[in-house]
């Protein structure tokens, strides 16, 4: 009798994706982050669902409802901090996952990569709208500053901003619609992640060497299921350590003050995972230029596959490209630090130099270095 998991219409989809999937025998722990992102998404959807049962999306009661969740709901504090810090873990995994893709040339799978870029945009939009919901000072002013950037779009800008606000400022209508979008987007993300996997399984996984692994495949289960479980346990360990020991470590103290349109906080800044993009935005003195640079800082990922000039796929055997990759990582960390600093000397000039270096590395220096490496190997 044929095994049910191979014949049942639903089971065979699961089987071909997670059980009998032929996987390269040499993929390292850097390939764990896809499954970790799936776990993060599930955690966020579940905790978010329970938070939504007690949250009210009204400007008068939003802040109080979050306080009520933390004080009066059974384990409400746990659910709330799991959700807030779960977002941070989500972005850590996301950045590492993208970094892996850049290092090992996984971006050569065009459809998978482009859906990944789309997923990054969707997750960033969801996180931004979620940050507005507690209706603290940083929620309100963050929403005001970021939505206001759209007014830089020529001709339609100011109308567009008022349309998004649903009025003449960030108010009840804005909060209500942000809650609605924040609720629906994770399900769209889950669907996109399914398509992401679908395209990945068309080609099979890449591997650290960047060479074809068709001749050397092993079944996903039990080898990589057990490896993924280890990753998940480590993720939960870090997440629970954050939630139970220092839940506010990555948050902003200003968000414990209810939103007040008449009082601007001294330093308006987004959550830590947006700081690199915020630094790039601030480093250009022109409003429209800043908005374009902000969009391009993420969109530049979509161009990466077309700038691949090396004859080798992975950076595993390319020491010069490796150096540049780690310079790019250091540059992004510098931008993240600058994004959290006030707009004054010397932070402004450091931010501008780091922003220029970011675009130069990806668009110019790395492709030229790859050609140089080809030359060294007389290819």
Curated annotation (Swiss-Prot):
Pfam families: Cytochrom_B_C, Cytochrome_B. It is found in: Mitochondrion inner membrane. The chain crosses the membrane at residues 33-53, 77-98, 113-133, 178-198, 226-246, 288-308, 320-340, 347-367. Its main location: mitochondrion. The keyword Transport applies. A ubiquinone binds at residue 201. Binds 2 heme b groups non-covalently. It is a multi-pass membrane protein. Heme b b566 binds at residues 97, 196. Its cofactor is heme b. Keywords: Electron transport, Heme, Iron, Membrane, Metal-binding, Mitochondrion, Mitochondrion inner membrane, Respiratory chain, Transmembrane, Transmembrane helix, Transport, Ubiquinone. GO terms for molecular function: metal ion binding; ubiquinol-cytochrome-c reductase activity. GO terms for cellular component: mitochondrial inner membrane; respiratory chain complex III. GO terms for biological process: mitochondrial electron transport, ubiquinol to cytochrome c. The keyword Metal-binding applies. CDD domains: cytochrome_b_C, Cytochrome_b_N. Heme b b562 binds at residues 83, 182. Heme 1 (or BL or b562) is low-potential and absorbs at about 562 nm, and heme 2 (or BH or b566) is high-potential and absorbs at about 566 nm. The cytochrome bc1 complex contains 11 subunits: 3 respiratory subunits (MT-CYB, CYC1 and UQCRFS1), 2 core proteins (UQCRC1 and UQCRC2) and 6 low-molecular weight proteins (UQCRH/QCR6, UQCRB/QCR7, UQCRQ/QCR8, UQCR10/QCR9, UQCR11/QCR10 and a cleavage product of UQCRFS1). This cytochrome bc1 complex then forms a dimer. This is Cytochrome b. It comes from Sorex gracillimus.
């Amino acid at each position: 009798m044929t095994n049910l998991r191979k014949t049942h219409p639903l089971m065979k989809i699961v089987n071909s994706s997670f059980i009998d999937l032929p996987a390269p025998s040499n993929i390292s722990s850097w390939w764990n982050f896809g499954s970790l992102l799936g776990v993060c998404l599930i955690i966020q959807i579940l905790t978010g669902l329970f938070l939504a049962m007690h949250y009210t999306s009204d400007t008068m009661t939003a802040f109080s409802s979050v306080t009520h969740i933390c004080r009066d709901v059974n384990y409400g504090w746990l659910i709330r901090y799991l959700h807030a810090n779960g977002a941070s873990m989500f972005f850590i995994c996301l950045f590492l996952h993208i970094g892996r893709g850049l290092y090992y040339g996984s971006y050569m799978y065009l459809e998978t990569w482009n859906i990944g870029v789309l997923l990054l945009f969707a997750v960033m939009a969801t996180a931004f709208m979620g940050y507005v919901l507690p209706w603290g000072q940083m929620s309100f002013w963050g929403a005001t500053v970021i939505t206001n950037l759209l007014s830089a779009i020529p001709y339609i800008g100011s109308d567009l901003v008022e349309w998004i606000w649903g009025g003449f400022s960030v108010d009840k209508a804005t909060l209500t619609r942000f809650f609605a979008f924040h609720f629906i987007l994770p399900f769209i993300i889950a669907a996109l992640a399914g398509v992401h996997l679908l395209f990945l399984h068309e080609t099979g996984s890449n591997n650290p060497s960047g060479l074809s692994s068709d001749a050397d495949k092993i079944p996903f289960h039990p080898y990589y299921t057990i490896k993924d479980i280890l990753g998940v346990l480590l993720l939960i360990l870090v997440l629970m350590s954050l939630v139970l020991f220092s839940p506010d470590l990555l948050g902003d103290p200003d968000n414990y003050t209810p939103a007040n349109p008449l009082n601007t906080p001294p330093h308006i800044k987004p959550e830590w995972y947006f700081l690199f993009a915020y630094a790039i935005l601030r480093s250009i003195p022109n409003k429209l230029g800043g908005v374009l640079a902000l969009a391009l800082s993420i969109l530049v990922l979509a161009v990466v596959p077309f700038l691949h000039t090396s004859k080798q796929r992975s950076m595993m055997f390319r020491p010069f490209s490796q150096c540049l990759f780690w310079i790019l990582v250091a540059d992004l960390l510098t931008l993240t630090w600058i994004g959290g600093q006030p707009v004054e000397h010397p932070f402004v000039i450091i931010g501008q130099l780091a922003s220029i270096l970011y675009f130069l590395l990806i668009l110019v220096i790395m492709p030229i270095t790859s050609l140089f490496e080809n030359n060294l190997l007389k290819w």
